């Protein structure tokens, strides 16, 4: 008689994905972020569901309902701050996960990679709409500024913005639809994650050497399940430390002031995880140009498989490319810092230089360095 785990139609899928999955024996801790993102997504859906039970999507009561959650609901403060800081953890892991993919050449799995980029877009959209829901000052003005960018689209722009707003400004209709989208998108993301995994399991995981590892595979369970649990433990310690000690560390104090359309905050800025893209947007004086740069700063990830010119897949044995990779990381950190600064000298100039370097590194320096490394190795 065959094992139920291997014969049952449903359990069989889980078995092939998480138990008997042949996995390279040499994958490092950088491969932990996939499972951590899965846990984050589950945590966000769960905490979000409980928040939705007490939240009201109405301009007059939204801010009060969030206050009510924190003050009157049993452990409401915990659920709210786990959800807010859980989003920050989600993006930290997302960026690490993408960085790992770039460093080790995982983008050569084109189907998996492209679905991953779409997942990033969906997650960014979800996070943006979630930030609007508490209806504080930064929620309202963030929504106004970002949705207004769509008016830069030629011909249909202004009509499109009013259509998204559901009126002539960000108001009740906007809040209600943002809540609806914020609720449904995580489930769409979950479906996309399943497709992401489906494509990944067609090819098998990459590994630090970037070489084929078919001759050296081990079962996922127990080796990598225990490794993932360790990662989850570290994640929960970090998240709970944030929630318990400094829950507002990554938030904006302006969001503790109820939304007021008549009073603009001195510095409108998004959450920290969007600051790099916001800096790129602001570094171009033209509205449409800024919007295109913003979109392309993320969309450029889809070009990585096309721009890959090295004979080696991974950067493990390519010191020059490694230098460029870390230069790119430093560049993104500079952009993140600039995104949070006011629009004045010298920040504008630094932002423009960092934005130019970002695109120049990815589009020109990295492919040409890879070609040079091929030459040096006489390949």
From Swiss-Prot:
Cellular compartment(s): Mitochondrion inner membrane
Gene3D superfamilies: Cytochrome Bc1 Complex, Chain C
Alphabetized CDD domains for the sequence: cytochrome_b_C (cd00290), Cytochrome_b_N (cd00284)
Organism per entry: Ctenomys pearsoni (Pearson's tuco-tuco)
Similarity comment: family membership: Belongs to the cytochrome b family.
Alphabetized InterPro entries for the sequence: Cyt_b/b6_C, Cyt_b/b6_C_sf, Cyt_b/b6_N, Cytb/b6-like_sf, Cytochrome_b, Cytochrome_b_C_euk/bac, Cytochrome_b_N_euk/bac, Di-haem_cyt_TM
Complex and partners: The cytochrome bc1 complex contains 11 subunits: 3 respiratory subunits (MT-CYB, CYC1 and UQCRFS1), 2 core proteins (UQCRC1 and UQCRC2) and 6 low-molecular weight proteins (UQCRH/QCR6, UQCRB/QCR7, UQCRQ/QCR8, UQCR10/QCR9, UQCR11/QCR10 and a cleavage product of UQCRFS1). This cytochrome bc1 complex then forms a dimer.
Manner of cofactor binding, per the entry note: Binds 2 heme b groups non-covalently.
Gene: MT-CYB
Known cofactor(s): heme b
Reported function: Component of the ubiquinol-cytochrome c reductase complex (complex III or cytochrome b-c1 complex) that is part of the mitochondrial respiratory chain. The b-c1 complex mediates electron transfer from ubiquinol to cytochrome c. Contributes to the generation of a proton gradient across the mitochondrial membrane that is then used for ATP synthesis.
Entry binding sites for a ubiquinone: 201
UniProtKB keywords: Electron transport, Heme, Iron, Membrane, Metal-binding, Mitochondrion, Mitochondrion inner membrane, Respiratory chain, Transmembrane, Transmembrane helix, Transport, Ubiquinone
GO biological process: mitochondrial electron transport, ubiquinol to cytochrome c
Transmembrane region(s): 33-53, 77-98, 113-133, 178-198, 226-246, 288-308, 320-340, 347-367
Cellular component GO terms, alphabetical: mitochondrial inner membrane; respiratory chain complex III
MF term (GO), any: ubiquinol-cytochrome-c reductase activity
Keyword Heme: yes
PROSITE patterns xrefs: CYTB_CTER, CYTB_NTER
Binding site for heme b b566: 97, 196
Major localisation: mitochondrion
Protein name, per record: Cytochrome b
Residue positions binding heme b b562: 83, 182
Pfam family, one: Cytochrom_B_C
Additional notes on this entry: Heme 1 (or BL or b562) is low-potential and absorbs at about 562 nm, and heme 2 (or BH or b566) is high-potential and absorbs at about 566 nm.
